[in-house]
Amino acid sequence: MQYKDLRDFIGQLEGLGELRRIARPVSPNLEMTEICDRLLRAGGPAVVFEQPAGAPHGDIYSVPVLANLFGTTRRVAFGMGAESMEDLRDIGRVLSALKEPEPPRGLREAGKLFTLAKSVWDMAPKRVSGPACQEVVWEGNDVDLARLPIQTCWPGDAAPLITWGLVVTKGPHKKRQNLGIYRQQVIGRNQVIMRWLAHRGGALDFREHALANPGKPFPIAVALGADPATILGAVTPVPDTLSEYQFAGLLRGSRTALAGCLTPTLSELSVPASAEIVLEGHIQPDPNHPSGYQHALEGPFGDHTGYYNEQDWFPVFTIDRITMRRDPIYHSTYTGKPPDEPAVLGVALNEVFVPLLQKQFPEITDFYLPPEGCSYRMALVRMKKQYAGHAKRVMFGVWSFLRQFMYTKFIVVVDDDVDVRDWKEVIWAITTRVDPSRDTVLVDNTPIDYLDFASPVSGLGSKMGIDATDKWPGETTREWGTSIAMDAAVKAKVDTLWETLFERPAGR
């Protein structure tokens, strides 16, 4: 699907019956979550809540809420410029070629490589003046997050939570900007807590800034309601040589239009010119905090694990200015026990990951992140095994290949005769091909998701690999079982008879 911006995208979705509008008042406090959860579980449409209820003084918010946008894999594919899930493998192949290009083996391959390189070059983002995202500007006391219909998703949540904010940062020693999606707890009229984990790009940029420029505010811009390609580019494993804005242009089929921020100290940051709302501001110094910058206690919030997370300290982002389009749309979501939007995104991005993994490990024939595994905590790998110990090599390869798999706790490796997308087959392989002592790999003291309260130490825990492949000589001294399979000729004969098998012959 080709589109210009978020508004064009949702307009096309509406024409396809993939988006519906809700005209009656609905509160962003819990009610939107319940409605969206039911819609997502039923494979339902994206929605626009036209009358968010509960604004200050009991009014209706003037800003509608867009939700459940990526609630189906089909809409994720549309957002990535594809027409179907199958097309996402092609995006993975492009990323694979960009990540590790191979020398061409002839003129034809050289031509393809040149065409790909030119396509990427042609999608370099462009700066524009008079952008739509700055049609309206709030400054001074007008900067008040209570004027936006920010969701409170679950009964035990500490506060309203910005969920789809595209956070733009830049380290002092880097040429390119970093785009990341980090949740932000509202703690005041113009302040939120920026929850980014230590290894994420935004946190790394902030740490470098604090070391290089101690005591100086750290500039940040947050784009709300960016176009889907830019949002999805921020959560895709884009090669370090390619900017997320450039990749978004490649997905969308048109260069990403960028705008400079209005705040002078944010001059090095660029935001999507078509974004619905932009927050401009800084993390301010605080000499009384050990880090030298303002921090606050974040959480608890219901998360994609299906649990409330524990509280922890994160930087405070103070907003100096809010710019927006005329009649803006607020894009929101919730996270909870799978399935939720992160789980759906995980299933779709899974198809992008497969060609990337196959480039490094050609023996991998399929790869699956089951949504029940909270997007990335469990991976199932199907492979063509070639030697003893091969499955264990693949396990460690997956854990170390992409940053996205650093937090994968469980990897199950099976042979090429097992469908990793069918739990019945995976369980059959585990129960018939695994000896727990021989075929289980445990690795201690590895990076673990901060939200994984099952780990003994926050951010540090163990991983498990299960080798559910047939065992080769050297892995067992016993005669290995042979899988039962019907004769191919008999299967073909029954296939031809099947439709008429229960018909009575004429005259009987």
From Swiss-Prot:
Any Gene Ontology biological process: ubiquinone biosynthetic process
Binding site for Mn(2+): N178, E244
Sequence positions that bind prenylated FMN: I181, Y182, R183, R195, W196, L197, R200, G201
Principal place of residence: membrane
Record SUPFAM superfamilies: FMN-binding split barrel, UbiD C-terminal domain-like
Record Pfam families: UbiD, UbiD_C, UbiD_N
E.C. numbers: 4.1.1.98
Catalytic center residues: D303 (proton donor)
Single Gene Ontology MF annotation: 3-octaprenyl-4-hydroxybenzoate carboxy-lyase activity
Catalytic activity as recorded in UniProt: a 4-hydroxy-3-(all-trans-polyprenyl)benzoate + H(+) = a 2-(all-trans-polyprenyl)phenol + CO2
Keywords assigned: Cell membrane, Decarboxylase, Flavoprotein, FMN, Lyase, Manganese, Membrane, Metal-binding, Ubiquinone biosynthesis
Cofactor(s) this protein requires: prenylated FMN; Mn(2+)
Gene3D superfamilies the record matches: Single helix bin, UbiD C-terminal domain-like
Free-text cofactor note: Binds 1 prenylated FMN per subunit.
Pathway entry: Cofactor biosynthesis; ubiquinone biosynthesis
GO cellular component, one term: plasma membrane
Localization per record: Cell membrane
PANTHER family xref list: 3-OCTAPRENYL-4-HYDROXYBENZOATE CARBOXY-LYASE-RELATED (PTHR30108), FERULIC ACID DECARBOXYLASE 1 (PTHR30108:SF17)
Subunit structure: Homohexamer.
Role played: Catalyzes the decarboxylation of 3-octaprenyl-4-hydroxy benzoate to 2-octaprenylphenol, an intermediate step in ubiquinone biosynthesis.
Protein name, as recorded: 3-octaprenyl-4-hydroxybenzoate carboxy-lyase
Source organism per UniProt: Cupriavidus taiwanensis (strain DSM 17343 / BCRC 17206 / CCUG 44338 / CIP 107171 / LMG 19424 / R1) (Ralstonia taiwanensis (strain LMG 19424))
